[in-house]
Amino acid sequence: MTNEKVWIEKLDNPTLSVLPHDFLRPQQEPYTKQATYSLQLPQLDVPHDSFSNKYAVALSVWAALIYRVTGDDDIVLYIANNKILRFNIQPTWSFNELYSTINNELNKLNSIEANFSFDELAEKIQSCQDLERTPQLFRLAFLENQDFKLDEFKHHLVDFALNLDTSNNAHVLNLIYNSLLYSNERVTIVADQFTQYLTAALSDPSNCITKISLITASSKDSLPDPTKNLGWCDFVGCIHDIFQDNAEAFPERTCVVETPTLNSDKSRSFTYRDINRTSNIVAHYLIKTGIKRGDVVMIYSSRGVDLMVCVMGVLKAGATFSVIDPAYPPARQTIYLGVAKPRGLIVIRAAGQLDQLVEDYINDELEIVSRINSIAIQENGTIEGGKLDNGEDVLAPYDHYKDTRTGVVVGPDSNPTLSFTSGSEGIPKGVLGRHFSLAYYFNWMSKRFNLTENDKFTMLSGIAHDPIQRDMFTPLFLGAQLYVPTQDDIGTPGRLAEWMSKYGCTVTHLTPAMGQLLTAQATTPFPKLHHAFFVGDILTKRDCLRLQTLAENCRIVNMYGTTETQRAVSYFEVKSKNDDPNFLKKLKDVMPAGKGMLNVQLLVVNRNDRTQICGIGEIGEIYVRAGGLAEGYRGLPELNKEKFVNNWFVEKDHWNYLDKDNGEPWRQFWLGPRDRLYRTGDLGRYLPNGDCECCGRADDQVKIRGFRIELGEIDTHISQHPLVRENITLVRKNADNEPTLITFMVPRFDKPDDLSKFQSDVPKEVETDPIVKGLIGYHLLSKDIRTFLKKRLASYAMPSLIVVMDKLPLNPNGKVDKPKLQFPTPKQLNLVAENTVSETDDSQFTNVEREVRDLWLSILPTKPASVSPDDSFFDLGGHSILATKMIFTLKKKLQVDLPLGTIFKYPTIKAFAAEIDRIKSSGGSSQGEVVENVTANYAEDAKKLVETLPSSYPSREYFVEPNSAEGKTTINVFVTGVTGFLGSYILADLLGRSPKNYSFKVFAHVRAKDEEAAFARLQKAGITYGTWNEKFASNIKVVLGDLSKSQFGLSDEKWMDLANTVDIIIHNGALVHWVYPYAKLRDPNVISTINVMSLAAVGKPKFFDFVSSTSTLDTEYYFNLSDKLVSEGKPGILESDDLMNSASGLTGGYGQSKWAAEYIIRRAGERGLRGCIVRPGYVTGASANGSSNTDDFLLRFLKGSVQLGKIPDIENSVNMVPVDHVARVVVATSLNPPKENELAVAQVTGHPRILFKDYLYTLHDYGYDVEIESYSKWKKSLEASVIDRNEENALYPLLHMVLDNLPESTKAPELDDRNAVASLKKDTAWTGVDWSNGIGVTPEEVGIYIAFLNKVGFLPPPTHNDKLPLPSIELTQAQISLVASGAGARGSSAAA
């Protein structure tokens, strides 16, 4: 390979790390303004025995800092001698390991010449990969004794470079930076961090690179102190008491003004006395009719004064108010009621009547003791609540209480509010607020933002959204006025700005979405607005500019917080346009979160060491610390423990000395000082001035067909397109029920000239459908955005569809109404296809290519405006499930029979058509040739790979009998695949054992970004599969790494530590895929096995257990041999068979990969390795409760049979064994290998086995409508259902298997299992139970599986009640929720 090719391969798709900068990147010349800051590094002037290469030491520090401030583990740097360093950094490395890695990389680079410029290389890559733009290969640099310019390269503009100058017998570090991006203050902090990090690393090189503090002396005072007293005992009183005091002090002052509707020219104005009196009446009614302190009262509300009256009435009664918006569908309203479980209900007259569905739910499910059916305040200040049967108003008897306080005492920890935030599976979480927070911050805010009793506030927040509390309580605290617009004022573009101007509003609370509504198509200025407080979502510069164009005196305050932090938020203030016209120009696109308000801290915590606060620029997770946090989630104690945590920086009772009992009447409702943090799940970093900026979600990821995708990242890139105004990317199910990325966006209508270039005519007949209209009218814009994104996103992160809309729908809370944004229906997509002018040049295609193109377009979810012969099926929106449909449609329409793997081998139109041409011209079938070729490859490949094995392996001896020795010895077991189905049970089996003189510690391999994330994955898998026990945690050590890499990518030191610790290796991890060819499975299933096995070649001797699969036997030879042996009275295929008779003939890539791995392991056994190959068949649900991996062939067959109503008459026996027994065999053979002097095989077979037909017909026994059909008839029924009628069926992804001679493919040879029996017999000494007789799957066991599938929603309930009742099983709610959400739909179990 030439040097040029080496560099091209090395620099494929590099990560261009961006050091956090202070100013926007210039979009036009000049792009750079070079500046330099220099500092002495005396630490490097003295010799260090361990670090001979001083340049590598300093480079290591720079790499560590880059990782800490960007989170990028792919480090790419331009370095000395015209080279580019690229390596993966690990957060668990010590500085020694980092230095060693970099030093080794530098030595390797010395042998690779770069006798060309990297500009030339980038142009070569552009040409080779046919890129539209020359790729940038690096953005950061670290040099030595080099005079460097940031714009030295044509295609690689450098942001920040460090140059180590050793020319004067001293070490001077020059920081060369673009001052158009970075402030002097930022650069000084980076220099201080570098110096501090270098000192710490050299003083103790064993320090973990992610745990060396980045808080410097110069920046410490800018950052929050997590041990500071935040006024835990400073309760200022309850908001309703403060309001009553105000009402008595100035009763005639205007409190609420409802502005007139279209049919009226008169406002409705109410005084503080009016609101106080009417709310007193409501409060006394609630109390007298049974509402107790702490009861929840639900308010069915409209926007207006009535809501204020109801809220105050509920609070005065000592109760908790919650609000339902009538805009929500009735079914959704019942969900909120189910979470809240109210004891009281108030219906505001203006909100209308409750839907009958809601009334039925209230009557059937709730225990309502107090109800007001039609509350409305009259213009004269009196209150009505609805008529009784005698004609009297329900509230009339309580009118005499209008000037009487209730006397109900509540305290700082009483719960005045129940607000809702999103939850899993569409079930909202109810957040209980605290009285401490409601009024605590208003006094500070009035001083900080100059808010007074003369201000006019607005009621613009969603009425069921917690910011509505700010709208109401802020003016009530101050004695100010609240103005209420009509729905027409809010909903008519441009009208809300006119309303703000007409009524002279001075202060408003907005969400960014409501702010966009305020400014959309608005021309009327509202200069009296002096403050706009934004909450609820990210606030962009564009949002601020639009608002200040109309409100030039408005200071904009971005407030960061959540429903869970209640009023405890941070703030960042944008100066008004009049105060500083250029203020926004200096800021980046997204407004920072700023600093905490009075006694509120945003703690950005080191993700690898939570005892550390992050330094300036370092990415961490944001925790909010304050005395004003909400109480927690209603009825979710486990989630409360996870999200509301005690401050670990101080002792739990540290602040108790501050709590002075002065006989306050509320003291019984006070839990004392509680220093708590709310874990937001947001990532953030500190700016040089101590402000905080958000960097996305720690969990803002989705998984599409195995790829982890950040939705926030996609939206950020799309928002940078010059014609995009608003955008949101979501995951939606398409017509095939496949999760699909789809972007909804609003274009820049204020740029009509630019936009017109991308507009197309829309036929009148489809103009009324906004989705169809957008897809047709702006398909050129969508194409341009996709082109724009190709340069910025990986192909799998590209939205499958971009829908252009006139506006994004908002929910009543002023946020984007995501449920209304759904994947277009097939009818809509067909209309788009019929009415879009194709830009495809037919002359580019041959006849067969044209047929292939048209066939693909007929089954793809979206129809691209242009297609070329070089377009890939997958680039056009295809995936493995659609590939199944495509292959069957091909067979039906073109009479060409191709195996499914063909599309993976020939993915473009041109290549796929050429393969069809070849098959037709040869008159043969592709399948035979492909199989023959691949068959030869896997066996030959395995033989070649054996040559890479060590010449010998140390042989381990058996463990001492578990009950024969004194003392306790720890057995250390390294296990792969622990987050999969079988792996989860292996882990549980190991850690559930308690032999007398042994304990177990599991070294669990998990792929994740860090140990915390890895453990979370492992724990989630355990909960999902029903195996997790909290006691396991202390006996688990997570091992990070990539099994496909030598030494898993670990340093030599860590590798040897592991090798010298581990006693047993259980290699269970594998990629299970029924379509992928051997080539795609070679790395995860074969190479990884060699790498795991290499752990047994060094250090202490180990047993090696490998989980294989009976798919290694799936050849005609073994089917015939099995029949022969059984006819002779023998049990079946011997465990001693060397499998050389399936060295050819295996047709599936998965079985081939397992065969190759087994072959290599047996050869290692000949060289001394001891242990066992465990060969299970179908690994099925847990025997006790059916816990299963729902993405399973046999379970899909159950569901598909229910959906079709038919089952095939197939008499084959099925080798099914419950997962807990398979795990038992794996662990038993790992502790007690069957053979002492050789590496043997243990086959897992069911005792008894069940016939395939009987397995499926169990559905009938438990009340499902299924009938038996011959396989040929059943096949036609399924094909007609799925292919012809497009009906949903769980077997859809497996059509290639179930419609292709299923009676043959479900054959399972009978197996000898004497080795498994021997190990289980020996295992009796370890477990106290003899399992050597084995277990299988009976009809009764299938009943348990059906019960499980019912409980998690995978199967519908049985249709007949006169059959067997489903068995009773026990599952935790957490497991049900996870499985129902799809968490159990994939597993890494090696067994098929």
From Swiss-Prot:
Superkingdom of origin organism = Eukaryota
Q: What class of enzyme is it?
A: oxidoreductase
**Keywords of this entry:** Amino-acid biosynthesis, Isopeptide bond, Lysine biosynthesis, NADP, Oxidoreductase, Phosphopantetheine, Phosphoprotein, Ubl conjugation
Of the GO CC terms on this record, one is:
cytoplasm
Gene Ontology terms describing biological process? lysine biosynthetic process via aminoadipic acid
Pathway of action: Amino-acid biosynthesis; L-lysine biosynthesis via AAA pathway; L-lysine from L-alpha-aminoadipate (fungal route): step 1/3
Where does the Carrier domain lie? Answer: 843-920
Q: Which GO terms describe its molecular function?
A: L-aminoadipate-semialdehyde dehydrogenase activity; phosphopantetheine binding
Please list the residues that carry the modification O-(pantetheine 4'-phosphoryl)serine. Answer: S880
**What residues does the Glycyl lysine isopeptide (Lys-Gly) (interchain with G-Cter in ubiquitin) crosslink join?**
K541, K1276
Catalysis: reaction(s): (S)-2-amino-6-oxohexanoate + NADP(+) + H2O = L-2-aminoadipate + NADPH + 2 H(+); (S)-2-amino-6-oxohexanoate + NAD(+) + H2O = L-2-aminoadipate + NADH + 2 H(+); (S)-2-amino-6-oxohexanoate + AMP + diphosphate + NADP(+) = L-2-aminoadipate + ATP + NADPH + H(+)
Q: What cofactor does this protein call for? A: pantetheine 4'-phosphate
Per the UniProt entry, the Enzyme Commission number(s) are 1.2.1.31, 1.2.1.95
Describe cofactor binding as the record notes it. Binds 1 phosphopantetheine covalently.
The family database entries (InterPro entries) matched by this protein are listed as: AA_adenyl_dom (IPR010071), ACP-like_sf (IPR036736), AMP-bd_C_sf (IPR045851), AMP-binding_CS (IPR020845), AMP-dep_synth/lig_dom (IPR000873), ANL_N_sf (IPR042099), Far_NAD-bd (IPR013120), Lys2 (IPR014397)
NCBIfam families attached to this UniProt entry: AA-adenyl-dom, alpha_am_amid, Thioester-redct
What's the further remark here?
Answer: Present with 7430 molecules/cell in log phase SD medium.
Q: What does this protein do?
A: Catalyzes the activation of alpha-aminoadipate by ATP-dependent adenylation and the reduction of activated alpha-aminoadipate by NADPH. The activated alpha-aminoadipate is bound to the phosphopantheinyl group of the enzyme itself before it is reduced to (S)-2-amino-6-oxohexanoate.
Family statement drawn from the similarity comment of this UniProt entry: Belongs to the ATP-dependent AMP-binding enzyme family.
Name the PANTHER family on file.
CARRIER DOMAIN-CONTAINING PROTEIN, L-2-AMINOADIPATE REDUCTASE
Q: What is this protein called?
A: L-2-aminoadipate reductase
The scientific name of the source species is: Saccharomyces cerevisiae (strain ATCC 204508 / S288c)
Q: What is the lineage of its organism?
A: Eukaryota, Fungi, Dikarya, Ascomycota, Saccharomycotina
Q: Which gene encodes it?
A: LYS2
